[in-house]
Amino acid sequence: MRIALVDPSRAIQRAMTELIVPGEHEVLAFSEGQKALNCIGADDGVRALITSVQLADISGIQLCAAARKLVGSRRPLFIIVMSSTNDYGLVVQALDNGADDFIRKPPFPEELRARLRAADRLTLMQRDLIKYATTDSLTGLLNRRTFFDDAVKACNGADSASPLSAILFDIDQFKRINDTYGHQAGDAVLESLGAVMRTASSGIIGRLGGEEFCLLQSCDLADAVEVAESVRRSIRALRFTQPEPFGITCSFGVAEWERGDTIDRILRRADIAMYEAKNTGRDRVVASDTFALTDQHEKWRGIARTTSPRRQ
């Protein structure tokens, strides 16, 4: 387990590092709280923070609150506050500000090691729970709820200087694949598509449900179309052999964030563009600015939604 240790005294840092069993944990020592925060923000491998109450720049209590806010609910971090005083008010304050444990300073060696073993167990369990709660088990991509949580934040942070585009796509004739080759083959398709997407982009990628996926990319419309084309070709190149050889294609709709857009609005335009790709031959990319979003598109899309439980 990687541990961020914060204390203004280098002597205390060295002594604490020596107390921790070598080989079981890696200690990153800091004299200032802000430097520790920067490390935690940049390194997802840090799973524990041990801090003294008195620091050179901010207090240990402030560091607790800032670190807890930084990692949020999507990353495990076990926080231990240590102090040489027996001030129970300080214990309460630390726990109320995000600490998980409180220990005397200097700690008894066996007590410190036992608490770190507990922290290791808890953060590993939390990591698994977070994974199960935020990812789609079949594809390894973000699940619908987590995707929309991240997408809303991305839309709120978008502006003319930081473009954002949505690439919405689904598997062509996926129901036929399940009906013809069986659901095991359908699952294999979804797993392979997830693997393609994880290597194709560093954007926000989620499975919205069934055979529908979305990628939010920090780029303008033209670049997003290029990304979509690259993904389309990669998916088209996939080959499956069970129970007999077959391939798949996907249809893509691309839309760029516009001032005042919510995630629902940008996905609506991408959705209509994707239906246009379906309606004009499948296995293609359609950008939302390449055709007028007329009432006819809305009417056709509404009919398709009503008459077909699954897109083809």
Regions found by a protein language model. Give the residues of each.
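Two-component/phosphorelay signaling modules centered on CheY-like receiver
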Residues: 8-29
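Short amphipathic alpha-helix used as the core "switch/output" element in two-component signaling
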Residues: 61-74, 230
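Alpha4 helix (beta4-alpha4-beta5 surface) of REC/receiver domains from two-component response regulators
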Residues: 62, 75, 85-101
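Conserved nucleotide-binding and Mg2+-coordinating catalytic segments in signaling enzymes
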Residues: 130-149, 169-183, 191
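Short regulatory alpha-helical coupling segments
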Residues: 130-131, 144-163, 194-201
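Hydrophobic framework residues that shape the active-site pocket
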Residues: 174, 193, 208, 213, ...
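A short pre-motif secondary-structure segment
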Residues: 204-207, 246
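Cyclic nucleotide signaling catalytic output domains
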Residues: 251-280, 286-311
